[in-house]
């Protein structure tokens, strides 16, 4: 087990390039760090162990040893983890780069075998080529990769992943790319590598190679917002932002293959990039469709629909003395935009409900209560129109000129009054609402702060470092820019 980790340790003194690239955290002094009960393969050292969350992408893919290096596969520093990373689509040229990388850093020939033979002290317990002392020579070249699926974008991190795991809660799945290359050609590459090994090590090498090179691919897993750590989220003035650490260098490569070209033909550029790299901190906004969905679900779970039957004049989120309407605790860490949406939505529904249904107190039990929760839960789904229509129908609409309308004459605060006028694009609010107007107001309140159709699916921490640097230079990392205010806001 952990053949890749052992190979990094023993091969690190072979060449100057190896000394720079093969220094991984798993072979350094251990520093204590909390684990998350997620068992899987660390993509940096490839050992099967308990994982913790990465500082660079907030996903659980690094072990408690490698976390101290703070490396991520999304860095732009050309460290070993970055060199083993490719984005889709995977081509034969990219796979050839991985094979050449292994042959460059972990060569197997007679001189290397003799070098390790001299390194291992030949005593009674070590006088043979035993797996225990020569595990670093048993590193076959396979094309297995841990694949992170960020919706339409896939990132492949190639490595020698030994062992088996149920892969529960892992943000990635293991995929075998041998069919995209050539099985016989890869077999030939490994036969040439093992030809320099002693006979007893050859059998172990071959067994490892055929066992891992022929495993079937797992079904890819879509990464969701729940897969990201909340440990690096900060809450300033009810704005949520995420602290992201990346290894950054001023050197850039236009194409993924150009980095590997420089590795073989322009090593000075690689050394310069490694020696001048630094750890750069980004404070990115956390506004994305995944988080909005999570917040809306929490909003619906904590919602107290009894408010629409009450006579409370205060905003719904500030009610603290009424046992039927108290949700103040739920908004302790909630984003202020969600709180604003909740207040306006329940205040509007309260005004419509009290205008049409005879109800006197928030302790009463009403048919509309489940529908209020459904409006919140479906506010950013395709079922929102059906849910709004159901809520409209329980308010006893009447037929006027072949159109159902509800009355609207209950008190509302001036801010909501102004917002509804802006949504309906009218100078004066009507005393009746049609279904279309009722629908437009609810959707306008939901979309006041962000247009969910334009939001990214995942946090910005999934972007490449070069992208984060460009967004920072353009001033687009802060949430104030990415609020994506709706068009109706501009018409005010």
From Swiss-Prot:
One of its GO terms (biological process) is symbiont-mediated suppression of host cytoplasmic pattern recognition receptor signaling pathway via inhibition of IRF7 activity. Its main location: host cell. One of its GO terms (molecular function) is RNA binding. Residues 82-176 are annotated as: Important for cytoskeleton localization. Residues 318-492 are annotated as: Interaction with host IRF3. It comes from the Viruses. The integrity of the zinc-binding domain in NSP1 is important for degradation of host IRF3. Belongs to the rotavirus NSP1 family. This is Non-structural protein 1. The lineage of its organism: Viruses, Riboviria, Orthornavirae, Duplornaviricota, Resentoviricetes.
């Amino acid at each position: 087990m952990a053949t890749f980790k052992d190979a990094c340790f023993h091969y690190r003194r072979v060449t100057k390039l190896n000394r720079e690239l093969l220094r991984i955290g798993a072979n350094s002094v251990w520093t204590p760090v909390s684990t998350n009960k997620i068992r899987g393969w660390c993509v940096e050292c490839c050992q099967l162990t308990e994982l913790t969350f990465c500082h660079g992408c907030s996903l659980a893919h690094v072990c408690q040893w490698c976390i101290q290096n703070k490396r991520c596969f999304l860095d732009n520093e050309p460290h070993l983890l970055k060199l083993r990373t490719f984005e889709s689509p995977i081509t034969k040229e990219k796979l050839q780069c991985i094979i050449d990388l292994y042959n460059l850093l972990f060569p197997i020939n007679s001189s290397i075998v003799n070098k390790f033979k001299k390194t291992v002290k030949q005593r009674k317990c070590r006088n043979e080529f035993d797996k225990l002392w020569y595990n670093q020579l048993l590193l076959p070249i396979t094309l297995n990769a841990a694949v992170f699926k960020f919706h339409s974008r896939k990132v492949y991190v190639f490595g020698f992943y030994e062992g088996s795991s149920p892969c529960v809660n892992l943000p990635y799945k293991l995929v075998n790319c041998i069919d995209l290359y050539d099985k016989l050609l890869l077999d030939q590459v490994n036969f040439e590598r093992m030809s320099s090994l002693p006979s007893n090590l050859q059998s172990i090498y071959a067994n490892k190679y055929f066992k891992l090179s022929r495993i079937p691919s797992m079904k890819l897993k879509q990464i969701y917002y729940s897969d990201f750590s909340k440990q690096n989220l900060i809450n300033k003035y009810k704005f949520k932002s995420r602290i992201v650490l990346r290894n950054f260098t001023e050197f850039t490569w236009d194409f993924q293959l150009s980095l590997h070209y420089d590795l073989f033909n322009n090593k000075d550029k690689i050394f310069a990039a490694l020696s001048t790299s630094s750890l750069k901190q980004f404070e990115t906004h956390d506004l994305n469709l995944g988080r909005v969905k999570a917040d809306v679900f929490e909003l619906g779970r904590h919602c107290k629909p009894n408010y629409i039957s009450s006579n409370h004049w205060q905003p719904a989120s500030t009610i603290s003395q009424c046992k039927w309407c108290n949700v103040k605790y739920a908004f302790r860490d909630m984003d202020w935009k969600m709180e604003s949406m909740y207040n306006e939505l329940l205040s509007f529904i309260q005004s419509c409900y009290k205008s049409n249904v005879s109800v006197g107190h928030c302790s009463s039990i009403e048919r509309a209560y489940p529908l209020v929760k459904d409006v919140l839960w479906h506010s950013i789904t395709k079922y929102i129109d059906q849910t709004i229509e159901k809520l409209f129908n329980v308010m006893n609409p009447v037929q006027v000129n072949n159109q159902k309308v509800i009355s609207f004459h209950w008190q509302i605060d001036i801010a909501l009054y102004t917002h509804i006028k802006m949504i309906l694009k009218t100078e004066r609010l009507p005393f009746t609402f049609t279904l279309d107007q009722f629908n437009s107001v609810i959707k306008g309140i939901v979309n006041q702060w962000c247009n969910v159709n334009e939001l990214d699916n995942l946090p910005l921490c999934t972007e490449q470092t070069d992208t984060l640097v460009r967004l920072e230079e353009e001033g687009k990392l802060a949430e104030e820019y990415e609020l994506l205010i709706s068009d109706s806001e501009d018409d005010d």
